[in-house]
């Protein structure tokens, strides 16, 4: 798979942009603040409907404009597809696929697959559990786009149940509590939560081997990286399906466990007005040499872990696509080489060099390792919101 053409209208610093892209490596070179990250961010937005830099859409629209438009012409296994996104802050975004409107914007998920490496990735190791849950869920949606609907339903139900807990807790303290409605929302949360949790556990099982081998590749063979899953459910806290070789519970078993745990925690939830049970409380556990990576890994080791997670994502998607799309997902490396020591830079570049399309941003050409600066590499100079191909 590769992006053949990118078109922007009022996206970030670009009033307009038309840019042809080819398979192989393309480096976007420019000083900080010139707009090179905006280009790869736009490509990532087509793939994920989100930015790796900001949580909302408003910053994506150029100052003074009402909306931004991103169009990406894609080629995959000899087939072409055109994805068009219209981003309007405060309103529902709109999408087209091959010129035809889609019913829901998320219906274009899966058309373009990308794996992004960025300086923010260090938060996968050093950040809070929400960063690691986001990593899992974004990869889930990339592999199985229908999970986007499951996640959206879960988030909506979680918000409604939290609001009900707050109001019911106040009513309980006044002696007029009615928990029947809460029982109904418990059922909804348990059903969608079990589906999301089951998908995460299946993904975790698939990730373990490629993550460890990817970590070894970028670290130079130093140590073992293991993945675990920390859950608020006693069923999973006992270690079932959260460690290598564990057998995953069925979705029905997870649903029943969620219901039982919510019932057990109900008084505490009503007192605090928050949902204490569910996949929104869980964490991906990273263990390096038998010790938690967070808090124990050095800066360099933390980078190796983060890169290992991203490379494992790439290898997993590549294996998924090897029949229909031998080239696999588009790799995006956004200013990541400037963060790495020489050894990790060279090892990472050697691992990704064979991808069908690699998009790299760098402040200066020298930041790009030699393995990604071959004769077939395109260079695009980015200055003040303009992108010009050159030597």
UniProtKB/Swiss-Prot annotation:
Subcellular location: Cytoplasm
GO cellular component: cytoplasm
GO process terms (BP): DNA replication; DNA synthesis involved in DNA repair; double-strand break repair; SOS response
Highest taxon listed in the record's lineage: Bacteria
Transmembrane regions listed in the UniProt entry: none
Function: The RecF protein is involved in DNA metabolism; it is required for DNA replication and normal SOS inducibility. RecF binds preferentially to single-stranded, linear DNA. It also seems to bind ATP.
Protein name: DNA replication and repair protein RecF
Lineage of the organism: Bacteria, Bacillati, Actinomycetota, Actinomycetes, Kineosporiales
């Amino acid at each position: 798979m590769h992006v053949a053409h990118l078109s922007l209208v009022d996206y970030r610093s670009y009033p307009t942009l038309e840019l042809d892209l080819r398979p192989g490596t393309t480096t976007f070179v420019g000083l900080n603040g010139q707009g090179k990250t905006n280009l790869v961010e736009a490509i990532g937005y087509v793939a994920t409907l989100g930015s790796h830099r900001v949580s909302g859409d408003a910053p994506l629209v150029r100052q003074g404009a009402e909306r931004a438009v991103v169009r990406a012409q894609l080629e995959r296994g000899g087939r072409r597809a055109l994805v068009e996104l219209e981003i309007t802050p405060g309103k529902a975004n709109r999408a087209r696929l091959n010129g035809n409107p889609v019913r829901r914007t998320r219906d274009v998920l899966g058309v373009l697959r990308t794996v992004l490496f960025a300086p923010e990735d260090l938060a996968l190791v050093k950040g809070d559990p929400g960063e690691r849950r986001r990593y899992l869920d974004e990869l889930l949606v990339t592999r199985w786009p229908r999970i986007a609907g499951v996640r959206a339903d879960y988030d909506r139900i979680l918000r409604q149940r939290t609001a009900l807990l707050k109001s019911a807790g106040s009513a309980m303290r006044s002696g007029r509590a009615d928990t029947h409605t809460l029982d109904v929302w418990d059922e909804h949360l348990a059903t969608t939560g079990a589906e999301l949790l089951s998908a995460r556990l299946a993904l975790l099982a698939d990730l373990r081997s490629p993550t460890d081998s990817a970590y070894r590749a970028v670290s130079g063979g130093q140590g073992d990286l293991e993945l675990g899953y920390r859950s608020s459910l006693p069923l999973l806290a006992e270690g079932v399906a959260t460690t290598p070789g564990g057998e995953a519970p069925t979705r029905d078993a997870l649903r029943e466990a969620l219901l039982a745990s919510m019932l057990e925690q109900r008084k505490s939830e009503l007192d605090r007005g928050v949902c204490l049970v569910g996949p929104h409380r869980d964490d991906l556990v990273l263990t390096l040499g038998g010790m938690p990576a967070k808090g124990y890994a050095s800066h360099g080791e933390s980078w190796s872990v983060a890169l290992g997670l991203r490379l494992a994502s790439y290898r997993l998607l590549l294996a998924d696509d090897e029949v229909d799309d031998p080239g696999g997902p588009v790799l995006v490396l956004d200013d990541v080489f400037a963060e790495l020591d020489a050894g990790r830079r060279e090892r990472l570049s050697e691992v990704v060099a064979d991808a069908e399309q690699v998009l790299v941003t760098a402040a200066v050409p020298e930041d790009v390792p030699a393995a990604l600066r071959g004769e077939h590499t395109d260079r695009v100079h980015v200055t003040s919101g303009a992108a010009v191909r050159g030597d």
